[in-house]
């Protein structure tokens, strides 16, 4: 992946075999387009993921391993979206960022980026263990194991993100990678390959396998509620694929551009424009994570109802009771048969409900 975000002060791209290519119009469009969408993604992602954090930390029920992973997914998304205002400032301010802020913003961005992808992958593996290998995984799906695995995931995210930010510095009003001469040609390629493989292809393969096996297991279960669970599974995989594939294709094409596969100026301009558009689509995935992974669960709906009641009480100046217990309990009774087929072997009753 090119150093994020794209340079907004460089109006020309140069090539040893081609004339200077003017991309000033694309840069101006990218500045306006990305600034607006970064602000929108920041606002929505901040609210959604904070709700997940508040719901999990304020819940009086005992924590489960699923809760641990969902909490860390929300934290990684928050770390990711927290950098977007700084990138917006970088886009619209000619002076860019201070050197220290450039380093920290880039580091937090990529740690949150890879952390979010890794925790989504871990959640798919956890669901595979809870449903497909329920009897064998009972002793391994504890809160203590969840905390240990989460710490390992954060360590892996930092390790994988390091090549993306270790050479970053503020140089001539741009937050860019300043590589040693011996690494100037190979390092950008390695970064792109790492992002494509560890940030997309490998997680997608793991998710696809885990959810395929889960669907196979659900099909063997005689229950009319399995259709809803299967739809949620397909939604998780399809949304991940649709939101991240275009962006990763553009990263791959950017890698090819480093080897002069696109000498035409028009093609380079099209690539730059496409990268800006697909970038916003991919980054907005962090806004959907709370909806897909958290708010589908009963405890999160209960917390939202509780929060809604508190807001009404503040607005109305008196206590307001929101009655949702009957509808929730009825829904819980209807869905209990499917859950019991798998979770009686596990330590986490939410394993199937949070598909």
Swiss-Prot record:
| Chief location | membrane
Q: Which GO terms describe its biological process?
A: adaptive immune response; antifungal innate immune response; autocrine signaling; brain development; calcium-mediated signaling; cell adhesion; cell chemotaxis; cell-cell signaling
So which tissues is this one expressed in? Expressed in lymphoid and neural tissues. Expressed in lymphocyte subsets, such as natural killer (NK) cells, gamma-delta T-cells and terminally differentiated CD8(+) T-cells. Expressed in smooth muscle cells in atherosclerotic plaques.
Keywords noted in UniProt = Adaptive immunity, Age-related macular degeneration, Cell membrane, Disulfide bond, G-protein coupled receptor, Host-virus interaction, Immunity, Inflammatory response, Innate immunity, Membrane, Phosphoprotein, Receptor, Transducer, Transmembrane, Transmembrane helix
> Where does the record place the modification Phosphothreonine?
346
Instruction: Report the transmembrane regions from the record.
Output: 32-59, 70-90, 104-125, 143-167, 196-215, 232-256, 274-297
Which residues face the membrane's Extracellular side? Answer: 1-31, 91-103, 168-195, 257-273
Tell me the GO molecular function terms: C-C chemokine binding; C-C chemokine receptor activity; C-X3-C chemokine binding; C-X3-C chemokine receptor activity; chemokine receptor activity; CX3C chemokine receptor binding; G protein-coupled peptide receptor activity; G protein-coupled receptor activity
Report the PTM annotation. Answer: This protein is not N-glycosylated which is unusual for G-protein-coupled receptors.
Keyword Iron-sulfur carried by entry: no
Cellular component GO terms, alphabetically? cell surface; dendritic tree; external side of plasma membrane; macropinosome membrane; neuron projection; neuronal cell body membrane; perinuclear region of cytoplasm; plasma membrane
Q: How does it sit in the membrane?
A: Multi-pass membrane protein
Report the locations given in the UniProt record. Answer: Cell membrane
Q: Which disease does its entry mention?
A: Macular degeneration, age-related, 12: A form of age-related macular degeneration, a multifactorial eye disease and the most common cause of irreversible vision loss in the developed world. In most patients, the disease is manifest as ophthalmoscopically visible yellowish accumulations of protein and lipid that lie beneath the retinal pigment epithelium and within an elastin-containing structure known as Bruch membrane.
Name the family the entry cites.
Answer: Belongs to the G-protein coupled receptor 1 family.
Name the job this protein performs.
Receptor for the C-X3-C chemokine fractalkine (CX3CL1) present on many early leukocyte cells; CX3CR1-CX3CL1 signaling exerts distinct functions in different tissue compartments, such as immune response, inflammation, cell adhesion and chemotaxis. CX3CR1-CX3CL1 signaling mediates cell migratory functions. Responsible for the recruitment of natural killer (NK) cells to inflamed tissues. Acts as a regulator of inflammation process leading to atherogenesis by mediating macrophage and monocyte recruitment to inflamed atherosclerotic plaques, promoting cell survival.
Q: Which PANTHER family match?
A: CELL ADHESION MOLECULE, CX3C CHEMOKINE RECEPTOR 1
The name this protein goes by in its record: CX3C chemokine receptor 1
């Amino acid at each position: 992946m090119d150093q994020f975000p794209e340079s907004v002060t460089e109006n020309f791209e140069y090539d040893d075999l081609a004339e200077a290519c003017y991309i000033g119009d694309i840069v101006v469009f990218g500045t306006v387009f990305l600034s607006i969408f970064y602000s929108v993604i920041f606002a929505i992602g901040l609210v959604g993921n904070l709700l997940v954090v508040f719901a999990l930390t304020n819940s009086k029920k005992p924590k489960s391993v699923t809760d641990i992973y969902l909490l860390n997914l929300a934290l990684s998304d928050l770390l990711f979206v927290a950098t977007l205002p700084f990138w917006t400032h970088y886009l619209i301010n000619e002076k860019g960022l201070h050197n220290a802020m450039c380093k920290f913003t880039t580091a937090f961005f990529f740690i949150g980026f890879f952390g979010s992808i890794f925790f989504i992958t871990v959640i798919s593996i956890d669901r595979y263990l809870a449903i497909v290998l329920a009897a064998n995984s009972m002793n391994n799906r504890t809160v203590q194991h969840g905390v240990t695995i989460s710490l390992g995931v954060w360590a892996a995210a930092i390790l994988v993100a390091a090549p993306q930010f270790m050479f970053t510095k503020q140089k001539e009003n741009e937050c860019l990678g300043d590589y040693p001469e011996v690494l100037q040609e190979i390092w950008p390629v390695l970064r792109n390959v790492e992002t494509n493989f560890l940030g997309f292809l490998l997680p997608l393969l793991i998710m696809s396998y885990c959810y395929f096996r889960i669907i196979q297991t659900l099909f063997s279960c005689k229950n009319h509620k399995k259709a809803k669970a299967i739809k949620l599974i397909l939604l998780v995989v399809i949304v991940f694929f649709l939101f991240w594939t275009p962006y990763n294709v553009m990263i791959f094409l950017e890698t090819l551009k480093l080897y002069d596969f696109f000498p035409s100026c028009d093609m380079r301009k099209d690539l730059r424009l496409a990268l800006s558009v697909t970038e916003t689509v991919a980054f907005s995935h962090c806004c959907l994570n709370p909806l897909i992974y958290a708010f589908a669960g009963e405890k999160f709906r209960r917390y939202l109802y509780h929060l809604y009641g508190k807001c009404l009480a503040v607005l109305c100046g008196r206590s307001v009771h929101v009655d949702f217990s009957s509808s929730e309990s009825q829904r819980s009774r209807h869905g209990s048969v499917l859950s019991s087929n798998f979770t009686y072997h596990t330590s986490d009753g939410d394993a199937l409900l949070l598909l």
